């Protein structure tokens, strides 16, 4: 920024207009003259000329509130009000006894006494002048200038204490300390304050979280969120569901945890909890190696498996409340018919009812399991249409493709109902072992976060 320094006194000005007006004080040039015939005053700026013209107006609109005096100009009234202030700070001259309210007026008065005694140095700016007339004109220029902000004084004193302030407004604002009036109530607590700025400071310091909540609810910070740089905003792309039994082909598999990665490659261990979508931006940053072995089931048994009374249940799987993608627990949720003989199955394929209305498919059964035969009229296509059947030679989730039932075990009610229907003649067979029937992978999942696993009912093993 360009500045304009004065070569005579060293003052610096920011604008050319102020620099030109200042030069008039050194050259004693007054280009703006009063047009009144009886007044020959001239001024260095148009503003000061217009302010002077108000003195020639017969209307005096500025009246003192303490006396009946009126003034043409507001600054004259302001100077007059200083005479009614009992706490004003007065600077008295020792030679003539005059008193001044400001330090600048007092120094200007002392410069006049110094000029009359032969000292031609300005008492305001310490400038040496050539003659007394030049010094007096120079002092008049200081009289027309406004006092700098550094010389502003606290000339307004409180009536109840010794504190002084710059303006009357500051004194009135200070009076709440003595009156005890607290009209500003905090909206978050019951605390009151005498000044508004004290309430604002208390709210920002103590209730910053409440203010943040109100800003979020009103939507004031929405523009702040959108103004964040794009590289700091994580964008999560929606993920398409993985096909059942097929490995993931994108780069997201490396960023998934070990448990999720193993469930993605092993459909027999799918859990009911959906995999949350991770940001694509974080995929290459956290590679996770695939597990070398499948997760081991929980071993926190409630009962001792080596006990004599518990030994028939040692090979049975623990019951898990699982809801898969293909409703693999359909066999457990179906109601059962009334039981008949557990060792005899009629051609109508009526099965015995088990326990509390649910059939638990065992993982391993004893060696004396009974193979069941299926009549040629049985059509299993409505049931098997729910799943994508693997090839007959593949292994299912239980390690064997045959489903065998021990003595007393029963098949679901859905199979007994489907035995009365026949829709596709290609599935008809004379006699068929149910163990040769390929079954879909049935998940074997243990819910995480529980201290003890849910055990099967005891009467499943003793029927």
UniProtKB/Swiss-Prot annotation:
Pfam families hit by this protein: zf-C2H2
GO aspect biological process, one term: regulation of cytokine production
Main localisation: nucleus
Molecular function terms, GO-annotated: DNA-binding transcription activator activity, RNA polymerase II-specific; DNA-binding transcription repressor activity, RNA polymerase II-specific; RNA polymerase II cis-regulatory region sequence-specific DNA binding; zinc ion binding
A cellular component annotation (GO) from this entry: Golgi apparatus
Keyword vocabulary terms for this entry: Activator, DNA-binding, Metal-binding, Nucleus, Repeat, Transcription, Transcription regulation, Zinc, Zinc-finger
Annotated compartments: Nucleus
Similarity section: Belongs to the krueppel C2H2-type zinc-finger protein family.
Subunit (UniProt): Interacts with THRSP.
Name of this protein: Zinc finger protein PLAGL1
